[in-house]
Amino acid sequence: MKILRKNHPLLKIINHSFIDLPTPSNISSWWNFGSLLALCLAIQILTGLFLAMHYTSDTTTAFSSVAHICRDVNYGWLIRYLHANGASMFFICLFIHVGRGIYYGSYVLSETWNIGIILFLTTMATAFVGYVLPWGQMSFWGATVITNLLSAIPYIGNTLVEWIWGGFSVDKATLTRFFAFHFILPFIIAAFVLVHLLFLHETGSNNPSGLNSDSDKIPFHPYYTIKDLLGVFLLLLALMTLALFFPDVLGDPDNFTPANPLNTPAHXXPEWYFLFAYAILRSIPNKLGGVLALVLSILILAAFPLLNTSKQHGLIFRPITQIIFWIFIANLLLLTWIGGQPVEYPFTAIGQIASITYFIIIIILMPVSNTIENNIIKL
């Protein structure tokens, strides 16, 4: 078996990626989230496939088809809630994975990091089009509000919006194409994941100390397969607890009402994992400015490798940047809270301050602290 896995053309690839892969001996539990994201993607594709068997992408029957899945399909309610809450678990793991990358300086592996940003954007797009499919009130108005933002693009904006809608409003054509996008995008994500892993295994993984670990490597299996299994069980425990005990806690009550183009909800708000970006969008009074800030709030992650001037890898021995990093996390949580609040004082003012702080930390404070710490080392 050992000879087969090392010589067989297909098994050899799996062997070099998951069995005999030389891995730093000191990587912590923060490195578990990559495998957990792969698990989340597998759960989402599997549950999504079963949901697609019973769902109809037509404005007249979409809402009732979701109700039919929950009421009449064997364990349909479980599949639906695993899929809905699986998306939340996916984004929790994604945020932690990106946060770990920032904290431990994984962005220096620029190819892996940039593919990761593409994965992040693709996952956000998938979640957005998926949220429209149940055709509830918040689904409909979320689709209307967010797609309408494209009209801020000069010259081609209005044409682009009508092209995406497939008409002059969000209607049957929009729902059909969103279902098509939602079905195909996870497979595109899976392809990008393979590219992400390919680039990662070209350079080898980073480690918590930020030091070169070439002299201290251990095989991935059995050490990290067992360690990843613990993460898998904890994730499944959290997901099953959410799906079985609190299935609707992260959803919006407005989505229990069928979509009505003549009745606007009191507060149109996206899913919780988009609230930080939504708060940044709302904090700028100008429409085009808001859209640019929204896009930049994600694309600014690509600036980390460019703005990094530190002589050290990661933040483990850098107390000043550590403090700035945790202020950044607190600011992100504040933006998430603000995104769910109504557009009125003092929430708008707090949102504007937090949005400015978000960009200042990444563009100014972190590079400045890098320079200060470099000078301290020289002393």
Curated annotation (Swiss-Prot):
GO biological process, one term: mitochondrial electron transport, ubiquinol to cytochrome c
UniProt binding sites for heme b b562: H83, H182
PROSITE patterns: CYTB_CTER, CYTB_NTER
Consequence the record notes for mutating V108I: In strain: Isolate LG VA1
GO cellular component, one term: mitochondrial inner membrane
InterPro entries according to UniProt: Cyt_b/b6_C, Cyt_b/b6_C_sf, Cyt_b/b6_N, Cytb/b6-like_sf, Cytochrome_b, Cytochrome_b_C_euk/bac, Cytochrome_b_N_euk/bac, Di-haem_cyt_TM
Coiled-coil regions listed: none
Chain ranges passing through the membrane: 33-53, 77-98, 113-133, 178-198, 226-246, 288-308, 320-340, 347-367
A Pfam family matched in the record: Cytochrome_B
Cofactor: heme b
Annotated positions binding heme b b566: H97, H196
Comment on bound cofactor: Binds 2 heme b groups non-covalently.
This protein's record includes keyword Iron: yes
Molecular-function GO terms, alphabetical: metal ion binding; ubiquinol-cytochrome-c reductase activity
Topological relation to the membrane, as annotated: Multi-pass membrane protein
Keywords recorded for this protein, A-Z: Electron transport, Heme, Iron, Membrane, Metal-binding, Mitochondrion, Mitochondrion inner membrane, Respiratory chain, Transmembrane, Transmembrane helix, Transport, Ubiquinone
Quaternary structure and partners: The cytochrome bc1 complex contains 11 subunits: 3 respiratory subunits (MT-CYB, CYC1 and UQCRFS1), 2 core proteins (UQCRC1 and UQCRC2) and 6 low-molecular weight proteins (UQCRH/QCR6, UQCRB/QCR7, UQCRQ/QCR8, UQCR10/QCR9, UQCR11/QCR10 and a cleavage product of UQCRFS1). This cytochrome bc1 complex then forms a dimer.
Family note: Belongs to the cytochrome b family.
Further remarks about this protein from its record: Heme 1 (or BL or b562) is low-potential and absorbs at about 562 nm, and heme 2 (or BH or b566) is high-potential and absorbs at about 566 nm.
Function as written in the Swiss-Prot or TrEMBL entry: Component of the ubiquinol-cytochrome c reductase complex (complex III or cytochrome b-c1 complex) that is part of the mitochondrial respiratory chain. The b-c1 complex mediates electron transfer from ubiquinol to cytochrome c. Contributes to the generation of a proton gradient across the mitochondrial membrane that is then used for ATP synthesis.
Record-given protein name: Cytochrome b
Source species: Akodon serrensis (Serrado Mar grass mouse)
